[in-house]
């Protein structure tokens, strides 16, 4: 297996221009494909997950042109629901941001569509372990025709595009906000209004804000009543905004901001105080820990401070919260990250993976059902470990921070960062001294 060893880093300093946000990139591509008119999407993320979405859209008859560096995509919108030849199968890798929204969008029918066609959505083995039942249950209430091809509640799925009739739909919000995002994005093209009621506590609310914000940019307003009920008018058509700029990925910013907070000064550009991404709030956690944070319109800067552990609910920033788990090793006092059950249904079971790998470097860790408790280490007591990444891009990037100790760190399968940040280790090396 390929691996990379990072030697101890004395200091980090520099500016990192962030790649586009994965969450925004795949939402923008899907909305642009469904919208009337041509949309030029700029600062698109060039990564595995986005490639899976682009490949799927092409096979669904969407025309687009991609720049040589794959960061500008001009999408010819269909102005209608997707159509395909019966029996089409789409492979979506481990891209939840493609699997979930497409599951809902492919249920939609065009007027006059007399004979629904079947399509199969499948992916890597890990995708077949990632639950989708809450979304499918909600879509079935709205009139969808979906069947599980292997294990109940999990992909692969067979979908027939016989349409969604709207009406009252209940959806469980406790596992993933992507299920609600998928339902919201399909609802305007249903045959009638949809009233969505959330069961349980909605996780990752800031990701719903991204969805609602982007739907508005594409011409559709949603009535949001305190994240408990959403009303979406039916028989609508998305309208191209002509251009859409993808913000820098705030989750990807977290590794560099944490590095600056631990041992130097790092500025990230492409995301700032007006960002629509919830993970910008990661910087507030660093502030609470003692880092010096500066906010700009289009940048965030983190400078080294004396870091102290925190005990916080991080349900609102589940992806960026992983970075706090490794940064916690450099703080005084224990850190507890709470209300993160949905780590268990991500690219891997991130709670188990994080606890296992932190222990390898010498940390004392308690893994709860929905929390993790971490005791810090003196810099000289870190152990040189080989870090398993579990084909999870965020595990690889989080553990790069271990090199800010007095000990090297070896990361297995470093290329798994291609899911969201193919050049991560080059950028990390560039700011390291």
UniProtKB/Swiss-Prot annotation:
Gene that this sequence comes from: aroA
HAMAP family in UniProt: EPSP_synth
Pathway recorded for this protein: Metabolic intermediate biosynthesis; chorismate biosynthesis; chorismate from D-erythrose 4-phosphate and phosphoenolpyruvate: step 6/7
Record keywords, A-Z: Amino-acid biosynthesis, Aromatic amino acid biosynthesis, Cytoplasm, Transferase
Record-listed E.C. numbers: 2.5.1.19
Name of this protein: 3-phosphoshikimate 1-carboxyvinyltransferase
GO terms for cellular component: cytoplasm
One Gene Ontology term from the biological process aspect of the record: chorismate biosynthetic process
Keyword Magnesium: no
Active-site residues annotated for this sequence: 319
Compartment(s) where it occurs, according to its Swiss-Prot or TrEMBL record: Cytoplasm
Biological function: Catalyzes the transfer of the enolpyruvyl moiety of phosphoenolpyruvate (PEP) to the 5-hydroxyl of shikimate-3-phosphate (S3P) to produce enolpyruvyl shikimate-3-phosphate and inorganic phosphate.
InterPro entries cross-referenced by the UniProt entry: Enolpyruvate_Tfrase_dom, Enolpyruvate_Tfrase_sf, EPSP_synthase, EPSP_synthase_CS, RNA3'P_cycl/enolpyr_Trfase_a/b
Similarity comment: Belongs to the EPSP synthase family.
Binding-site positions, 3-phosphoshikimate: 22-23, 27, 176-178, 204, 319, 342, 346
Subunit structure, interactors included: Monomer.
PANTHER family, alphabetized: AROM/DEHYDROQUINATE SYNTHASE, PENTAFUNCTIONAL AROM POLYPEPTIDE
Catalytic function, reaction form: 3-phosphoshikimate + phosphoenolpyruvate = 5-O-(1-carboxyvinyl)-3-phosphoshikimate + phosphate
Record-level Gene Ontology MF annotations: 3-phosphoshikimate 1-carboxyvinyltransferase activity
Major localization listed first in the record, in broad terms: cytoplasm
Binding site for phosphoenolpyruvate: 22, 96, 130, 178, 350, 394, 419
EC class: transferase
